[in-house]
Design a protein with these regions (language model features):
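Metal-associated gating/positioning segment near the N- to mid-region
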Residues: 48-112
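N-terminal metal-binding scaffold of metallo-dependent hydrolase/deaminase domains
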Residues: 1-39
Length: 188
């Protein structure tokens, strides 16, 4: 199906945001952005100057799957994300069981491919059980599909532990995401 979206304010590209552009879409794929596009046989929709932009990315989602799917699962999280304009989300590791091994990563990746309307990328836990004591098997989780390391909403109490995680994680060129808070200073 061919569609031309007319009079779009295109945000996040090299196009002048103060000019209205047309977007030619064929079979769900943007083929061209330009001025006064005419495509034979295309349905034309005037969007009246509304903003069109790339999908958003949420890098801190607490999806309750696995473990508490009655609250939210991968399918419902993806529907909520898509409704809000997000085309990619990450999955924090503080699920039940924690994403601290390749089996749980494989579950998230597989279920996301099967049920999700958006891209879902899991973070692996930096520690077993998100407890900040023993380093999780980051290499195996990396091979299974994690895109970063985090202990979710848990604090890292030991700078030495975090340093060791960073050294290990550097081998895989993965980002380490952590709450920058020291309980001994914050009184938590």
């Amino acid at each position: 199906m061919k569609t031309v979206l007319k009079n779009c304010r295109v945000l996040g590209t090299t196009h002048d945001k103060d000019m209205l552009h047309d977007i030619y879409v064929e079979n769900g794929i943007i083929e061209k952005i330009g001025l006064n596009l005419e495509v034979e046989g295309a349905k034309q929709i005037d969007v009246g100057g509304h903003t069109v932009m790339s999908g958003l990315i949420d890098m801190h989602c607490n999806i309750c799957d696995p473990g508490h799917e009655y609250i939210e699962d991968i399918a419902t999280a993806s529907r909520a994300a898509l409704r809000g304009g997000f085309t990619t989300i990450t999955c924090e590791p503080n699920t039940d069981p924690v994403i601290d091994n390749k089996t749980v990563v494989e579950y998230i990746v597989s279920k996301s491919k099967e049920k999700s309307l958006v891209n879902i990328y899991p973070y692996g836990s930096m520690s077993i059980g998100c407890k900040g004591q023993e380093i999780a098997e980051i290499g195996e989780m990396y091979d299974a599909g994690i895109v970063g390391i985090s202990d979710g909403d848990e604090f890292t109490d030991s700078a030495a532990f975090l340093r060791n995680v960073m050294i290990y994680t550097k081998m895989f060129d993965l980002p380490v995401l952590t709450h920058c808070e020291d309980r001994s200073l914050s009184g938590v």
